[in-house]
Amino acid sequence: MHELGVVFHSIKQIHQIAEENNVKKIHSVTIEIGEVSTVIPYYFEDCWNWAIKKEPLLKDAKLIIEPIPAITYCEDCQKEYSTINYGKTCPYCKSQHTYLLTGNEIQIKQIEVID
């Protein structure tokens, strides 16, 4: 389970952002997780809930997870399609000259603070 490492990295980034903006307490954090990022949202949330208990800045902070759809682009027919449904093979022209546009990333979208 690598989700714990991703949670620790996210918490480190949140601390840096909070320090730069003189934030003392965070109410909620929105994290975007790509459909093919290999991070399982349920495990991420479980690790988050465990990790923030030790963090005064984040204690009781709500975690909001938003999925990023996995979209693949076909270089031959220049169309986009759902990676989850079709994988690497383009459903329009059957080409395998494709690459992932979105869905592999994990990013902090929003941090809501308490004044």
Regions found by a protein language model. Give the residues of each.
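Short cysteine-rich clusters marking metal-coordination/redox-active sites
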Residues: C74-C77, C90-C93
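Short loop/turn motifs enriched for small/polar and acidic residues
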Residues: E32-V36, E66-A70, I111
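Short, flexible, mixed-charge glycine/proline-rich loop motifs
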Residues: K62-P69, K79-I84
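Short acidic DE-rich linear segments
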Residues: I114-D115
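Short functional micro-motifs and their immediate structural scaffolds
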Residues: S82, S95-Y99
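Cys/His-enriched microdomains
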Residues: T72, K88, I106
